[in-house]
Amino acid sequence: MTSENHTTIKADSALVMSPTGSTSQAAPFSPSTSKPIQELPDELIQAGWSKCWSKRENRPYYFNRFTNQSLWEMPVLGQHDVISDPLGLNAAPASGEANADAGLGNGQRKRHPSEDASQAGPNSFKRPKVEIPATPTTPTVPISPSTPGVKPWVNTTTDEKQGQASTPAPAPYRPSVVYWDLDIQTNAVIRERAPADHLPPHPEIELQRAQLTTKLRQHYHELCSQREGIEPPRESFNRWLLERKVVDKGLDPLLPSECDPVISPSMFREIMNDIPIRLSRIKYKEEARKLLFKYAEAAKKMIDSRNATPESRKVVKWNVEDTMNWLRRDHSASKEDYMDRLEHLRKQCGPHVASVAKDSVEGICSKIYHISAEYVRRIRQAHLTLLKECNISVDGTESAEVQDRLVYCYPVRLSIPAPPQTRVELHFENDIACLRFKGEMVKVSRGHFNKLELLYRYSCIDDPRFEKFLSRVWCLIKRYQVMFGSGVNEGSGLQGSLPVPVFEALNKQFGVTFECFASPLNCYFKQFCSAFPDIDGFFGSRGPFLSFSPASGSFEANPPFCEELMDAMVTHFEDLLGRSSEPLSFIIFVPEWRDPPTPALTRMEASRFRRHQMTVPAFEHEYRSGSQHICKREEIYYKAIHGTAVIFLQNNAGFAKWEPTTERIQELLAAYKVSGRSLPSPGPSSTNTGEKDSKPAPERTAPSQDNSSPVDKTAQDTTNT
């Protein structure tokens, strides 16, 4: 039980806010803390038991500080220790009935095998049934913690359990390093909203989506190779997915299908930047000479093989010939001379080369989009068929009544009930949890698997017995794996996040409790926005940030480094700040790109809501890798090779409440100086368990007037330097 405060006084407050629109007058209602607390017998106190009061449930519960066990009913004297004596062989029951129920948690009725067989699904976590009302005002936190010693992720049948009865239950897994703090409650307030109409996730559909997305990546690779003779720009497909989702009105959570315009500016720009060849970073003089020669040769070949105007052919051929002559006669040139000559050649030939490649590149973008739309149609049809076979109607779903009131933010709820889930197998390989469905395996560290279990217990309201937990974890990991690709370190920058000490400083100094761009895998707080509401909502997501409209709260934003997404983010910030009179604050972390500056950075610097701005120098701070849920511990932190601009956007009330004073800024900068790789155990020390804001890729989509690759501008940020 890692997120409960075991005290007779401290507890959680209710979620309901007064609909008056004022957070100062709308303090959440909470029951009195002056409830008389019944004294426990000395025997129970000596055994580690104490009686605590739950404000959430408005009733007492009992907590054992030695075993971390929590019970609603008073512990029975002589009850056995479920950890040291899981079978109750040494117990001293008070009655025959108690003896018959030995091995069960206190207050739990022994279940018959027939009941277990009928109620336990293929992905069942054997947990005591917990009733959680599905109202948005109910705190999305577990009513009762799991019983120590019980491993809910063990998928076994009743017969298997009986055959293994002689094996003691293993001790609960406790990660040695924690990169999150799930105890922090939100201060983000929103208007109550109806459940979303997304189709509920299912492993069969997720597997089909993964296969078609991989096939789409292959189509993209083939088109770039066949039509332009280049490799697809690194991460360009990933940024295409991000950019398309800014404008997409389609129904699939991952693939775009209804976008205007059809031609993606992001994909078009990145392919054009690698034509006629991809320019790489140069360290030595000979490399610069070879690169200049290759560029001149490729430009001449392209202009000869395409339908170019006579003027374009003349300009390109003359400049290429002039460059070749210079290379033949000048053997004493330095690296800088070669690079200057290359820049001159690009300025002269670039516009003509781009004009002959324009139609072909637009054709690539258009074809990829239309293939994606066809794949979306197939996936949707298969999903609807599956739901129909389970007698689940999509069109007949009644919309829930929503009151016009302010509430603390709560996870996305789905209006369509989930179908029965197919079996997902789980096993552990050292510190790695491996989940397999139809031969497709996904992996996650045991620490992050434990974190997903906690998030699921806090957020999910339709699966109190954890019967769908494993299948939803498989879908979640598979979705992010497919979105960011299977290459080495591919997409990890798009999922990176701030160091733990920085999150701690943001929370302590500026009241930050919410991440605008994160995922269940890399979030620090248990409340965050993410890309996929249909699956992430079960793990605490409040949905995509561009459709999330808080009335008040303090937020951290570290968006994926996609220019179109960052620009849309700034528009959303200014709209929210302009509409709300309640305290509202956004602290934004974006790359310090000045050659040229990104539109998002320029707009934020000129915003009327900008209260403060600072820069953290390159190589003097770190990020956490987006693959932190699976990579080695020593690879989690990496140095940033670019500066990071930190901008405070606040309305008047937010500035008054969370003003970026000199002292607070100094504390934030000091947190950046703490190396994550030197921390013995990052994260809150008070918890035993517990990853974007989505820290996007330390890569930038290069502007159209620059023919260098995005990778060349920023290199690979996932290596420790």
Swiss-Prot record:
GO biological-process terms attached to the record: methylation; mRNA processing; positive regulation of translation
Q: Which gene encodes it?
A: pcif1
Q: What is this protein called?
A: mRNA (2'-O-methyladenosine-N(6)-)-methyltransferase
Could you tell me what this protein does? Answer: Cap-specific adenosine methyltransferase that catalyzes formation of N(6),2'-O-dimethyladenosine cap (m6A(m)) by methylating the adenosine at the second transcribed position of capped mRNAs.
Q: Which UniProt keyword terms apply here?
A: Methyltransferase, Nucleus, Transferase
Instruction: Give its localization.
Output: Nucleus
Q: Where does substrate bind?
A: 239, 269, 563, 593-597
Q: Which family does it belong to?
A: Belongs to the CAPAM family.
GO CC terms, sorted: nucleus
The EC code for this enzyme is 2.1.1.62
PROSITE patterns per UniProt: WW_DOMAIN_2
What is known about regulation of its activity? Cap-specific adenosine methyltransferase activity is inhibited by zinc.
Gene3D superfamilies for this protein: 1.20.1270.10, 2.20.70.10
What domain of life does the native source organism fall in?
Eukaryota
Q: Mutating residue 239 to A: effect? A: Strongly reduced methyltransferase activity
Looking up InterPro entries in the UniProt record yields:
HSP70_C_sf, PCIF1-like, PCIF1_WW, WW_dom, WW_dom_sf
Location, primary (coarse class)? nucleus
Name the Pfam families on file: PCIF1_WW (PF12237), WW (PF00397)
Q: Does the keyword Methyltransferase apply?
A: yes
